[in-house]
Amino acid sequence: MENNAHLMARYASACQVHGLVPIVEPDIDVINGSHSLDKATQVSTQILSVFFKVLQDYGVYLEGIVLKTSMAVAGKKASQPSLPQDVAKATLLALSRSVPPAVPGVAFLSGGQTEAQVRKPFHHHQRRNGLSSGGLF
């Protein structure tokens, strides 16, 4: 976990020195396994917290990055699959607990999900909350 964070921090620093906007990606495998949605949220929060601490330790200008990450979802072999509204809530919770407000953008990976599966949490969140999401969706 920390090795990836250090590599990404060095990459981000080098990009910024040369006037580029780095797209940084923490190493979070959320789709494989039998973990619950709650466990995915907890692990995502922990990894993102460590990730951003390392970026800050390296002096990365957080206002000049894009975070590329996965949504918090239960594992493929979980006893209870994740509902779209729960994925939206869990993902927003993990991000709001760990991503500094200075980060201007988040790009989501599919995490092995289909396009329809990826879109459902976003659509659910926007139907329920309008376009407002604290800047995350």
List PLM regions with ranges.
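Glycine-rich anion/phosphate-binding loops
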Residues: 1-11, 46
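Non-transmembrane, interaction-prone segments in cytosolic or luminal domains
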Residues: 3-7, 16, 87, 106-109
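Substrate-engagement module of ASCE P-loop NTPases
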Residues: 7-15, 51-56
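Active-site capping/gating regions of soluble enzymes
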Residues: 32-137
